[in-house]
Amino acid sequence: MTDIHNHKILILDFGSQYTQLIARRVRELGVFCEIFPHDVAADFIKNYQAKGIILSGGPESVYDSDVKAPEIVFELGVPVLGICYGMQTMVMQHGGEVKGADQSEFGKAIINILNSTNNIFSNMEHEQLVWMSHSDKVTQTGEHFEIIASSTNAPVAAVAHKNKPFFGVQFHPETTHTENGKQIIENFVVNICGCDTLWNIENIIENDIKEIKQKVGTDKVILGLSGGVDSSVVAAILHQAIGDQLTCIFVDTGLLRLNEGDQVMQVFAEHMDINVIRINAKNRFLDALRGICDPEQKRKIIGKLFVDIFDEEAAKIENAKWLAQGTIYSDVIESAGNNQSKAHVIKSHHNVGGLPKEMKLKLLEPLRELFKDEVRKLGLGLGLPYNMLYRHPFPGPGLGVRILGEIKKEYVETLQKADAIFTEELYKHNLYHDVSQAFGVFLPVKSVGVVGDQRRYEYVIALRAVVSIDFMTATWANLPYDFLSLVSNRIVNEVKQVSRVVYDVTGKPPGTIEWE
């Protein structure tokens, strides 16, 4: 079998918010790549055997920082592409000069390609729309580099080494705003580095199954199945690899979407014939959450109880040696903090390092190398339903953070019904995949309404729908008024505990996507 990691690109991270985007663009071309901090050991870089190296952008200023690329990068003889800060430090380390720009440049710009012969601009038009994001600029390229593209505000918009396969761009080819950014990255990765496109779903499935079989042997494996994308794909790949050696534990918290527990059992236990143990823990969660109003406290209680129940059930499975988890590559990067990424750590992730200390199980993470979009494609390749893989994100605590304040059984049932109507109508009107996330929120306040001739004094449901690329920022979805009116009418008429429906028009920032 072909080694899908054989031809690979090493990405050194200088702290850019776009570093993961670079990796995703490379992988979309069918080439494996990994992200490591810029100051990783020289021996590691040497032994990594990359076909090429990409230096990411970053927030530092080259002329007042000691953050630079390791010299080994330029001694290996492999092609190098510096992006933004990566270009600046590469040029400076070769005798060039970088200074603060008179005017920072953030946004779209037109560059003129001056030389497209056998370089990153091969087979491209001379005028290109790109995305700039920089405060410094290269003012002198030095004796080793030549300018191969320029713009009005950045006379040195791209460079190439005169004798070695080193290239730099002042803009960001990895963003969708750079019109032909994919072509630039492909020219570097495939044409200049000579990488074979081995990284595809068929090869990944074959490779993963082989690795799982070798690692696990005849041992038993336990997986906490939530019905979310990651754990669902882990269940599917493990089932193909080891069959009935896998036991899934599905803890039904009672805080899932309407009928979600039954759907999980239908797909995995009935359709795929996977061994799934369903634990009905609804009452335990409601009891533990009684009287609790603080969002963070609710999250902690839900998280701890979930782990406790999982541990109880896992202990009943004899001779289990492995605990499988749905850790994906972005989790690994995000949670590694300063040991892995120079960007600020936003949060710790529940999937990484989550092995209970008292459990003497080895950790199995089949998706650890994959980004979310790759996980979804893998799931399709394994036969999982499209609607399961491309559902909107759902928080770990479930409806526990979509019911404001205290959680009661009545509130959960009311929200489940209202949320299901909203989702159903989004699908019916072909709007579901036009928005990034959509859901209902239960507000524990009552409002007067009139249904027929009867006065009704019941609860309020807020509808939330947003459009986002990365969920770091989001805009509220401008859904048609007729559609919102239809959803509102259905909820008020069909859910007796609701007398009023409102629509949230807050972006992120200043708001967050979830209400709690």
Curated annotation (Swiss-Prot):
EC number(s) per entry: 6.3.5.2
Q: In which pathway does it act?
A: Purine metabolism; GMP biosynthesis; GMP from XMP (L-Gln route): step 1/1
Give the transmembrane ranges.
none
Keywords of the record: ATP-binding, Glutamine amidotransferase, GMP biosynthesis, Ligase, Nucleotide-binding, Purine biosynthesis
Cellular component terms (Gene Ontology): cytosol
Chain ranges of the Glutamine amidotransferase type-1 domain:
8-198
Tell me if Oxidoreductase is a UniProt keyword of this record. no
Chain residues that bind ATP = 226-232
Q: Which protein, by its recorded name, is this?
A: GMP synthase [glutamine-hydrolyzing]
**What species was this sequence derived from?**
Francisella tularensis subsp. tularensis (strain WY96-3418)
Q: Lineage of the native species?
A: Bacteria, Pseudomonadati, Pseudomonadota, Gammaproteobacteria, Thiotrichales
